[in-house]
Amino acid sequence: MSREDLSIAEDLNQVSKPLLKVKLLEVLGQGDFKHLKALVDNEFQPKDDPSVQQVLNLILHYAVQVAPILLIKEIVAHWVDQVGDEKSSSKSDDGIHLDLNYQDENGNTPLHLAAAQSRSDVISFLLSQKSINDCVKNKAHQQPLDMCKDLNVAQMIQLKRDDYFLETVHSLRAAMNKRDFSKLDSIWKNPRNLNLLDINGIDPETGTTLLYEYSQKKDIEMCQWLLKHGAEATVKDGKGRSPLDLVKNIKLPAKPSNNVTPEIKLKNLLEKNLREQAIVHEDVASSKPPTYKGFLKKWTNFAHGYKLRWFILSGDGNLSYYKDQSHVDRPRGTLKVSTCRLHIDSSEKLNFELLGGITGTTRWRLKGNHPIETTRWVNAIQSAIRFAKDKEILNKKKAVPPSLALKNKSPALISHSKTQGSLPEASQYYQHTLHKEVIQPSSVSLYRRPSNNLSVVSSEIQLNDNLTESGKRFVSKMIENRLDGSKTPVGVHTGSALQRVRSSNTLKSNRSMQSGSGVASPIDKVPNGANLSQSNTTTGSTASLSDNNYIDNFEGDEANSDDEEEDLGINFDRDEEYIKAQYGPYKEKLDMYEQAISIELSSLIELIEQEEPSPEVWLTIKKSLINTSTIFGKLKDLTYKRDKRLVDMVSKQGDVNNVWVQSVKELEMELSNKTERLASIDKERRGLKKILHKKLLESHATAGNKESLENDKEQESDTTASTLGQIAKFISATKEEDEASDADEFYDAAELVDEVTELTEAHPEISTAAAPKHAPPPVPNETDNDSQYVQDEKSKIESNVEKTSQKFEKQNNLVTEDEPKTDQSLKNFKAEDKESQVKEKTKEIASSVIGEKTIVAVTTVQKRKEEYLLKEGSYLGYEDGIRKRLSMDKDDRPKISLWAVLKSMVGKDMTRMTLPVTFNEPTSLLQRVAEDLEYSELLDQAATFEDSTLRTLYVAAFTASSYASTTKRVAKPFNPLLGETFEYSRPDKQYRFFTEQVSHHPPISATWTESPRWDFWGESFVDTKFNGRSFNVKHLGLWHIKLRPNDNEKEELYTWKKPNNTVIGILIGNPQVDNHGEVNVVNHTTGDHCKLYFKARGWRSSGAYEITGEVYNKKKQKVWILGGHWNEAIFAKKVVKDGDLSLEKTRTAASAGNGPTDDGTKFLIWKANDRPEEPFNLTPFAITLNAPQPHLLPWLPPTDTRLRPDQRAMEDGRYDEAGDEKFRVEEKQRAARRKREENNLEYHPQWFVRDTHPITKAKYWRYTGKYWVKRRDHDLKDCGDIF
């Protein structure tokens, strides 16, 4: 026979691998082991053929993807060898021996593929096999757990691995106690155990390593076994002791002797190990930062509870979390561990908290799936915190901290670190890899086996200042408490001193890898974006806010932020049906059918491409296509059933939600109706009391003429007596309610304001009475008709303002098409004359607006400040006066249900909400800050008083007065863009205001206001949440006032934090603003302080808007008390005796216009301005803020809020354009942020810097002093392009 004939014969006899795969898939889909065995016996011949062997080895790989669980169990029972099964080698009589951990071309084991398809029944069965190894990594460096898409399955794998670990540790300790070395060897030979156990771990019960324990017992044989299997003599225990310390004082004999003591043997053994380790690991010292990854449950909100999330602690010190492993390119949140501290409750075995962020307000409530897992995470995070702190020390002082010294190769550094008391954490004993980066024992880092994997160095694991006190107590007791609730038998923890330190590389790119075996590995389906490296784990998504620099470097904006993750992920406390709805019913079967079709078709293509079709091949192809068609039919039917079930579940859930919403709405309506009814009753009661009071006064007035009028008034007296009797009866009936009301402790503001008005009308001389003897002539208040200010001066001011306003009334205070030219005289100033001419020009503008000056600088510091404001041209451009009205007459925004939009945003931060533009008002949050200055006259008046406690009283009234403008203002202001600014000067009130948005996430506005008598600055920094029924706003920023009193040259510093705000009544469509909480206004110069109490809205309307307070001197004595309503008026009186500690019910003469009194009578401090009906419910003051006055526009920088297009369109009623512009400017902001991230640039504010206040020692935003100078010089054109 020729060679050509032999070649043809060989080709005919060669086994077709694609044909075998197609036939195998057909049989696996039938689920009958007898058919599978017949196929293998008849078709898979000869057994030694390479193609046959390849397909045989992959039987289990195909089975876990397309076969039912019963067939998989039979395959394992008949063909898979088990560890420790003596019959396993002989149970297969056909010579087939499958490896449960065999890896295909992509490195996937059957467990990998089952995990990728989330086949929980298959995974549970495989993990129950003795020979399984769930720590094997594929070529993408993923363990089976890393490939799970179903979070339920991932949690199951975690729990099973933890249970196996505890069981193995218990067995290992039992074998050690029995000195069963054969059992120890068998345990240690298991590859899975090598990945999970660390022989150098610390026993939590004894606090020592195994080698130290048996060295102390002088058990030479056991020490030899431990050293042979990787124990190291240099590893220190929980008290900083190593086995070498036990033998360091033993002296070796000068000459060898046959009579060697156990101590000498032990010393020789340990020193030999030390020499070997020094040689083997000479270059293995590790100084890599701690890394870790895995699943944890994170608390989101009350609506969704805990959700399982994928966490990664990266080497750059960032802890980030993701929805799952496939979304590692989109972190939902990031914390810099160097700014964090751990809080752990020793009574909790699974929960711990991470408190962090520069403000200390970030709070992550985390929960492990198992006590051991929680322990590992606690140690990993604590290790990372210590590493970051030590790195900072190293960078600043160029010194090696103790925790980093252990990583140095020099043995001298080991002893040094010991003297420094750098002790490892006892609880690191439980560290074993769980698909994660895992912690290394601290002392082992010097002599660790070489590894290409990223490892966690835990020399930092020790009690440190980053743990709270309860956390430190917990770490000390962690071991004894941690396993109490586990199902492991008692005594297991006594031997769990073994953990192999292993680590897995961070996730790499999971690009498609075509398997030559034809196994359609689900790893091919992982998105290409899942690429995470050590260097760029969280680049571009880190919210890193250092003390000295707030930066805009956060992934989320209000249009794409989802870190509160509502409606995402799984809450494992819910019922099974709801969990299935998240993934979809019949998911496992659908995945199996899809995978079967995919593999079948790929195998057919491979068969057609590689074979010349023969009759047998065509028959196989036909059967395969029929089988594929059958599977597709099942897939179609099951998909229809799934969709129908999902629709039913969604409809049912929608009905449940509607019932819930309707129930809550009805409850809100009922509460609202009761509140209105109580309010009407209360008003009626007050009216009757007023009638009674009036009748009594009339009866006293006519008492002198009683005799002469007795006959004429007899009938009227009877009527009066009858009326008074009825009134008295009504008042008696409501007496209990009246006495129970806290509101009656103080004057009702509305009632007393009416009384003051009546007094003023009846006695005009009150308004022109002399000022109190302890105060100089006060500053005019243009808004208070009942004040004590001089009437003719006030008339003069109003007259001048009115003239100036009428000058531009024809323009309706809007921008004209012909923009006025900038005053050329200012542009042509000579350098030497510029400041003086600017000063004169500023005086001229102020004079044109207010006429004769009404606020006179008295002291040197006041005059110096006034000169400073004039020199910098603070009022240039404000010649036009203030705007009195908007361009539109009424608010004609489209009506949209607020609840319909907000119901999907429960639990979210308000600043991250994306709402339709119609829910906005045409103001910015920067302008909302400016509204605090509406009643700045209170500060001017405070500076006139000699008494420091009285100054404190008026400053406190100023802090409360700003909330009068919040009533009816429930629309959302525009969120400022990063770098956006706003200026506002009032020549008539002699102050200038400036603010800048210095941070976007979190949103922070820094502000600075200056006036001759006072300065006002602070930061608008709030934490906001929507809980379904109300918006909650918590103010975090500290506010400051520097007052310059008229009576001395010493300035006074006041600070306070604003009360909390709540918007209620959202469900019933009647939103209202409520302010509540305690405010402490502190005078740091004199030691005086005022406590203000904003009362939360209760059942009765008389309790709404209520405010009370007390002023104390530096001796802690109460000097003044105040009360009223923050939306109407505030009154006060002086405490003249010990028992006079509140504003009592008894009416006394109220001073309407004379200001403070010292005799204990009540006087009016402040009264709110009138609120006429205006579009968007804006106040008259708010209307002035966004006015594009013609003379002002040329002076403004391009970042000023008045030039913002979306807000301007909103003000003019162009709502569609406003929405489009809002989207455009926010996209522009995001593009700028991405550009900064690409270039590794940090954002720095232009006009403010983060600093520490010399008096309060608190961080604050300090104004650099450059804005008004550049404005005066027309040097603001290049300050930024943000609109």
Swiss-Prot record:
ANK repeat windows: 106-134, 206-235
Subcellular localization: Cell membrane; Endoplasmic reticulum membrane
Keyword Manganese in annotation: no
UniProt cross-references to CDD domains, sorted A to Z: PH_Osh1p_Osh2p_yeast
GO CC annotation: cell periphery; cellular bud neck; cortical endoplasmic reticulum; cytosol; endoplasmic reticulum; endoplasmic reticulum membrane; nuclear envelope; perinuclear endoplasmic reticulum
Top-level taxon: Eukaryota
Identification of the protein by name: Oxysterol-binding protein homolog 2
Organism annotation: Saccharomyces cerevisiae (strain ATCC 204508 / S288c)
